[in-house]
Amino acid sequence: GRNLVSALENIRDKKDTTRNIQVECVYQYDRKSTSGELMDYCKDADFVFNLAGVNRPKKQSEFMEGNYEFADTLLDALRKNNNRCPVMLASSIQAALMGRFAGSDYGKSKLAGEELFFKYGRSNGVNVLVYRFPNLFGKWCRPNYNSAVATFCHNIANGLPIQVNDRNTELELLYIDDLIDEMIAALEGREHRCEFEDTTA
């Protein structure tokens, strides 16, 4: 979320005047934040970006805890505050559970989060946006954590071995600045929607 927070702060601080929005506050909630802070943020928010998630757990059960249970807590806080602001969920192409992603525990947890968001939107008349991210690369991506490109570049630059599991696999990539542009467009109410084989993204 650092790239999004930086972009929003640049708009707030008038360093970026190219956008057709005003940003007064940027609330950041993470593992160190309190449930009281979450309630306060959910009372005042005009738009919620849920970028929380677990992608490198110690136990498989942590996928559901981080990718579903927090989403449920977040949506419940919005519901309790009667806040019907738009909500955006960062999901993954693995949620399709097709091809090389079939049976992915990570994908299952992301799909469960998507279904929760869509149900919340239908029940509460809220605009819900779900973005299924492919492999991201760019500023602040971390090797051996959240970016295959960062890992590849890090290993090459440091003379470390690289691993290619299947040379025939086409890797889907998204540059972080392009993603941030779309997220700001969504904040402005200019989101892009697409549908892929029984899936709306």
What residues fall within each predicted segment?
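Short-chain dehydrogenase/reductase
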Residues: M64-Y68, G103-L111, R142-N146, L173
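Conserved beta-loop-beta element that borders a ligand/cofactor-binding pocket
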Residues: E115-W140, H154, L160-T169
